[in-house]
Curated annotation (Swiss-Prot):
Organism of provenance: Methylibium petroleiphilum (strain ATCC BAA-1232 / LMG 22953 / PM1)
Record-linked Pfam families: CbiA, GATase_3
Name under which the protein is recorded: Cobyric acid synthase
CDD domains, sorted: CobQ_N (cd05389), GATase1_CobQ (cd01750)
Residue positions of the active site: C347 (nucleophile), H456
All residue ranges annotated as the GATase cobBQ-type domain in the record: 266-464
Record function comment: Catalyzes amidations at positions B, D, E, and G on adenosylcobyrinic A,C-diamide. NH(2) groups are provided by glutamine, and one molecule of ATP is hydrogenolyzed for each amidation.
Pathway the protein acts in: Cofactor biosynthesis; adenosylcobalamin biosynthesis
Disulfide bond residue pairs: none
GO process terms (BP): cobalamin biosynthetic process
Amino acid sequence: MNGRTRSPARAVMVLGTTSGAGKSWLATALCRWYARQGLKVAPFKAQNMSNNARVVPGSGGRLGEIGSAQYFQALAARVLPDVRMNPVLLKPENDTGSQVVVLGEVRADLAAVPWRERSERLWPFAQDALLALMAENDVVVIEGAGSPAEINLHASDYVNMRTAQAARAACLLVSDIDRGGAFAHLYGTHQLLPAAERALLRGYVLNRFRGDARLLEPGPQQLLALTGVPTLAVLPMWRGHGLPEEDGLHDEGPGWQRGAGNAAASLRIAVVAYPRISNLDEFQPLRQLRGVQLRWARSAEELAGADWIVLPGSKHTSGDLAWLREQRIDAALARHAAARRPVLGLCGGLQMLGEALVDPHGVEGENGEGNAPGLGLLPLVTAFEPDKLLRRTDACFDGVGDEWSMLRGVQFGGYEIRHGRSVQHPALPAAAVALRNAEGEAIGWQQGSVLGLYAHGLFESTEVLRALFGARVRGLESVFDGLADFIDRHFEPGALMRLLADAEPGKD
């Protein structure tokens, strides 16, 4: 389609019978598969709920946030990510409330609006972004959210079938057969959709199947007879695809997750999994490293045996710090640091490692909830500011030593998403400035074996991985091509191009 006047785009949408069915990675695979056919492709998800976010170009030359899944999908599609690909991002802050990000920018005025009213106010932003992407591309690969057939939410659900209808999309419905009940999930979802929405379903996908696919017979044929929709693919269980799962933390057990290494020779890295953990996807490369074992630790006991302890990002630093103390993880961290064993804090984790959190503007809650003593492992004071700092960061390690000396001189590109601003405590001996950005600003500090950084993306840098572990991981291009090869093998021959033919062209 490239090289001539572009006809209206066609859309392929990935729906799921449940959360965690495999929508995100399949949408990513489709982005690369269609891009390899010479088509101009863009991803889209009307609304994402996640604390995994990336910094991308927004409107007016400003930077904004989108969900990490759409960021990776854009890279798979070989296009520059932008805020229209995920026009609404909800970042949970507590059990009942979320920060609302619209076209990359925080909209505080929408946070307290009731859900149904807010959905109607957000839909025009999502629709405009979708239509703009369809006007600029040959194919738009759309990811749904949860299930499209939640009958109590259906009237206000703009992320699934309302988006599908606006795009005139050919829809795939994915079910996780490893959980059991896949045929019932597919049939029930089909039956609960109104007739006009059912008509958009073009194929079923059975994901994460173990064993001989012939054991499924005659299920797909009976499902076709009942619904008129064919099963286009049975995808085998595949844990090694290399992409982070959007809800991957919740799928992990409490034990050490071993990559390619020998258990006895492995470096054990424990990541503290507090309730409002954010940007956990940046740890995905560690799962691929030979000789590294990863664990999500939710208690002091689960830190036992760790060589490194990592405090990741947090969407609510003071709240997660209180939780950390309730679990007695603070004492375990102090012992670990006193033994000169590596402790790493990233963004919110860095803030926790300091002397104090100060919240004069109530960013983390009213009535002083955001004010708290820190862990005292770095001589820093962090103040939370109302304006969120978003930026892409080119940084260089310069003042690192001791346990982190192997990073000296290493450069990497990361990103920052934060309300906190940290400075050295004036009454305490200064920590070494460990990391500076291209402007020379300090964005990382070290004291003894404790290192705190504001830049996310550390473990996504091949230079950093080589310095820390003497290792390389598969590059993203290899991961994306592997995904495309996988679906090419397991979808019915010609099915993916037929989906485009079945999709109605978008409006000019």
